[in-house]
């Protein structure tokens, strides 16, 4: 049993349910988008991001356990992450991810761009339905950060003089922002105080910078 599996064991069943629910949520009635979504969520991966959100949610709400809104937040987190990967693969012209054909390789670039857009739109829709403006602000900031991080990466791709602080800022936008703000959003949904919300944000940010592979 590896470390990630051990870490996520308390929410293993919840993660299985999450993947099934994601496939249902993405099924938009359009056969190509539905096929792309099925392909995306059948490609494996650690599901570490939604797993961390679920673990945090359980830890800060031991009396009530996971609520429907906490579970939906975890689903939104994975939708945003997956949408960003689809777009990244197009920009990077990657043919495979985790040993599986990327969406634009299996279908085409147009379908991949639209599939990524559709996932972002779905995430935004379900985010709005949480009926919590502070959570909406946190996750909307993430989507802005993802776009900003990708732009920074491509503008500085061949800049060997790039400062370490610029590199860290780019990496925060592309990776750490999502889990940091999702952890904080879990706390917002649980109604915890501002000091603990800051601690959740800091935990997500520092944890994500501390692990060797964040893709």
Q: Which residues does each predicted region cover?
A:
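N-terminal amphipathic/basic leader segments beginning at the initiator methionine
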Residues: 1-24
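Mg2+-dependent prenyl diphosphate-binding active-site environment of isoprenoid biosynthetic enzymes
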Residues: 16, 23-214
């Amino acid at each position: 049993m590896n470390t990630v599996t051990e870490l996520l064991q308390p929410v293993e069943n919840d993660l299985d349910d999450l993947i099934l629910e994601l496939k249902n949520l993405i099924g938009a009635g359009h056969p190509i988008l539905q096929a792309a979504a099925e392909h995306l969520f059948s490609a494996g991966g650690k599901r570490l991001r939604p797993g961390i959100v679920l673990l945090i949610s359980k830890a800060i709400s031991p009396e009530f356990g996971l609520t429907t809104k906490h579970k939906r937040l975890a689903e939104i987190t994975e939708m945003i992450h997956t949408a960003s990967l689809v777009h990244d693969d197009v920009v990077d012209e990657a043919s495979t991810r985790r040993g599986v054909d990327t969406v634009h390789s299996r279908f085409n670039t147009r379908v991949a761009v639209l599939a990524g857009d559709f996932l972002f739109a779905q995430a935004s829709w379900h985010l709005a339905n949480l009926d919590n403006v502070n959570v909406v602000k946190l996750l909307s900031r993430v989507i802005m950060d993802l776009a900003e991080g990708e732009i920074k990466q491509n503008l500085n791709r061949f800049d060997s003089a790039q400062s370490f602080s610029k590199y860290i800022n780019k990496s925060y936008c592309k990776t750490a922002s999502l889990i940091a703000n999702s952890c904080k959003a879990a706390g917002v949904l649980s109604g915890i105080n501002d000091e603990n919300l800051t601690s959740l944000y800091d935990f997500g940010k520092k944890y994500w910078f501390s692990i060797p592979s964040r893709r």
